UniProtKB/Swiss-Prot annotation:
CDD domains reported in the protein's UniProt record: UBCc_UFC1
Pfam families cross-referenced by the UniProt entry: UFC1 (PF08694)
Annotated family: Belongs to the ubiquitin-conjugating enzyme family. UFC1 subfamily.
Active site as annotated: C116
Gene name, Swiss-Prot/TrEMBL: ufc1
PANTHER family attached to this UniProt entry: UBIQUITIN-FOLD MODIFIER-CONJUGATING ENZYME 1 (PTHR12921:SF0)
Source species taxonomy: Eukaryota, Metazoa, Chordata, Craniata, Vertebrata
Name assigned to this protein: Ubiquitin-fold modifier-conjugating enzyme 1
Length: 167
């Protein structure tokens, strides 16, 4: 998996029990309850550890998610909009997180700003269906991607901090 801090953070995220996707209307409501509770717990834990880095919300059906994530680099906060849809084959298929404003700036991204998680995250997700949910997607997918890609994009001058854009 990853370093000890990540293992600890992930071990504190509640595992999900309901194996259901959006096509199964009755069980999806139960799964959605679990999906809401796990990120809430993860964000609470992150805040307690002074490591708060994202917010998520969804449409009423829980099939479209959006929010913000941020990354601190050299004491500057870089903030990005994120979005993803729940696949109809969820939870067997992991959602694909998109950061539209970074589209085309890194090779580790697909068209539309979808971040590449195929090599490291998707096999881990597949081994943990249906226990993993959106909080795990953030902790083991988006978080590590940001930690690798954002400093690289900054060093290449492909993204700049908002305060530096005006000068």
């Amino acid at each position: 998996m990853a370093d000890d801090a990540t293992r600890k953070a992930v071990s504190e995220i509640p595992l999900l029990k309901t194996n259901s996707g959006p096509r199964d209307k009755e069980l999806w409501v139960q799964r959605l309850r679990e999906e809401y509770l796990a990120p809430i717990k993860y964000v609470e834990n992150n805040k307690a550890a002074d490591n708060d880095w994202f917010r998520l919300e969804s449409n009423k059906e829980g099939t479209r998610w959006f929010g913000k994530c941020w990354y601190i680099h050299d004491l500057l906060k870089y903030e990005f909009d994120i979005e993803f849809d729940i696949p109809v084959t969820y939870p067997t298929t992991a959602p694909e997180v998109a950061i539209p404003e970074l589209d085309g700036k890194t090779a580790k991204m697909y068209r539309g700003g979808k971040i590449c998680l195929t090599d490291h995250f998707k096999p881990l997700w597949a081994r943990n269906v249906p226990k993993f949910g959106l909080a795990h997607l953030m902790a083991l997918g988006l978080g590590p991607w940001l930690a690798v890609e954002i400093p690289d994009l900054i060093s290449k001058g492909l993204i700049t901090h908002r305060e530096q854009q005006g000068s």
